[in-house]
Design a protein with these regions (language model features):
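ATP-dependent small-molecule kinase phosphotransfer cores
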Residues: 304-395
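NTP-dependent small-molecule kinase module
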Residues: 215-218, 222-240, 422, 428-482
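Hydrophobic positions on the alpha1 helix immediately C-terminal to the Walker A/P-loop
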Residues: 282
Length: 482
């Protein structure tokens, strides 16, 4: 992608000391926005790296509090030509450890950066160093029950590798690029308190694909015992965090938050358009695009399918039939009176539900999430006889002023979103896509949306174009908003 090529060329030109330090087997995928790019940056080059991030419009994002570690930051970038996102997992400290708990800091950053090599123009960790780090990472992350389960599966299918497919592929990839003598020298130069012979034996078994579950368990125990001096937190703190994570991953417990959020506050985005403008499809695709790394929620403000609305509609249908066939003017009048109030109750219920959704959206945005809404109720459409997703009782002001005022006051509490994207198109184009609606109502909705003018909050989007062009334009505008 253009952004990767230009960004890393800039870092190289400005002599920023960095390298891609793990999973180089998937480097190409990372450079194309398919997976993370794990970068190690020299502490003394942090300012230069930060300047480069700003120059190329990378945006800081935050992991959930339980997944934040000192010297580790996250950024996302945007490739304008493809509209793909890339994720930089930036390390100033080499922090690693168990699954969900990076409790160790290996202070070997200087060595990794001094011995880096280049793949084309991309600096990467030396293969022998990467293999050593991969062995440590894999065995720290391996749980005893996972090793036992894998061994059980191996009994059923002997050809099965001793690790999961992804891990095995990475280890085999690195072994093929590793010289045993250089690997031994790396062990000696780093001087980590681990057994050189044990690691050399492991390398030989790995190259011959003869690793057993016993080998994995023994090496795992050895790594944890020998690297205890590299723990970055106290044993008590470490045990407390581990117990908390174990508890929260039990069945029926509230799931731990995994998605990243914006640093200060999130955004509420509204897609507004008449029927046939592609709102629902755009909401789905934008949610898929952003939720790769960010916490994204979609909120539908349309009329909900609920027991209340179903009951009201059934009651009014029955009352309508009764009003048509029962004799007596007074009876008919009373039935119309009842229908009017049950209908009003339904619209007030819908208004209260929309207000609750607005408050929920604000709460989500305040915690850094992005909220994408469909059929957002806007006061901008209040001049319509039947405002789109807005108050419906104005015409009943003579009969039930209290209900009208209650509905109006409810909608008045719903503020504007951070950005309204008005999906504007000619009526004939929308009619081709959606021709099963009342034509006059459809025309009024199209005219109302097309009447929206650009402002600080409103961004008109021309949808008289191929869908992919519309989607790319929306992605570019949303990126500017983040």
């Amino acid at each position: 992608m253009d952004i990767c090529r230009e960004f890393f060329t800039y870092l190289n030109t400005n002599q920023v000391r960095y390298c891609h330090w793990k999973s180089t087997i998937r480097l190409s995928e990372g450079l194309n926005g398919k997976t993370d790019l794990d970068l190690l940056i020299h502490q003394n080059d942090k300012q230069s790296f930060d300047e480069a991030l700003g120059k190329f419009d990378f945006k800081r994002i935050l992991s959930p509090k339980w997944k934040r570690y000192p010297g580790v930051e996250d950024y996302i970038g945007f490739d304008r030509s493809t509209t793909a996102l890339i994720h930089l997992h930036v390390h100033y400290n080499l922090v690693l450890g168990e699954k969900h708990l990076k409790g160790h800091h290996l202070r070997i950053e200087e060595y990794i950066l001094k011995t880096r090599v280049f793949v084309d123009t991309m600096p990467v960790v030396q293969p022998e160093v990467e293999l050593l780090l991969a062995i440590i990472r894999v065995h720290m992350k391996s749980e005893v029950y996972e090793i036992a389960l894998n061994q059980l599966k191996k009994y059923l299918r002997p050809a099965r590798p001793p690790y999961t497919t992804g891990i095995w592929e990475e280890l085999v990839f690195l072994v093929k690029k590793t010289s045993p003598e250089i690997f031994r020298n790396v062990l000696r130069e780093l001087n980590l308190p681990v057994s050189e012979q044990l690691f050399m034996d492991y390398l030989e078994k790995l190259s011959q694909s003869t690793i057993s579950s016993h080998d994995i368990l023994y090496l795992r125990q050895h790594i944890f015992e020998r690297l205890r001096p590299f723990k970055r937190i106290s044993p008590v703190h470490y045990s407390a965090i581990k117990a908390f994570i174990k508890l929260r991953t039990l069945p029926l417990m509230p799931a731990l938050k995994n998605k990243k959020v914006l640093p200060e506050t999130g955004r509420i985005i509204a897609l507004v358009g008449a029927d046939g403008s592609g709102k629902s499809t755009l909401v789905r695709d934008l949610q898929s695009w952003l939720s790769w790394k960010l916490s994204v929620r979609t909120v539908y403000f349309g009329i909900p399918e609920s027991m209340v609305t179903s009951c009201v509609q059934t009651v009014n249908r029955v009352l309508g039939i009764a009003e048509k066939y029962l004799p007596g003017k007074q009876v008919k009048k009373n039935l119309r009176y009842i229908m009017r109030y049950t209908d009003a109750g339904q619209w007030i219920f819908i208004a209260r539900g929309r207000l609750a959704l607005f408050k929920k959206s604000r709460k989500l945005a305040s915690s850094g999430s992005i909220v994408i809404t469909d059929r957002y109720p806007l006061a901008l459409f209040k001049s319509m006889d039947h405002p789109m997703d807005g108050p419906r009782l104005q015409s009943q002001a003579i009969y039930m002023p209290f209900a009208v005022n209650l509905e109006k006051s409810t909608y008045d509490q719903i503020g504007l979103p951070d950005r309204i994207f008005a999906l504007q198109a000619d009526f004939p184009a929308l009619r081709k896509r959606k021709d099963n609606l009342d034509e006059q109502q459809h025309i009024k909705k199209v005219e109302a949306v097309n009447a929206l003018k650009p402002s600080e909050c409103i961004m008109p989007i021309n949808v008289n174009r191929p869908y992919e062009d519309v989607l790319k334009d929306l992605k570019r505008e949303i990126w500017r908003l983040l």
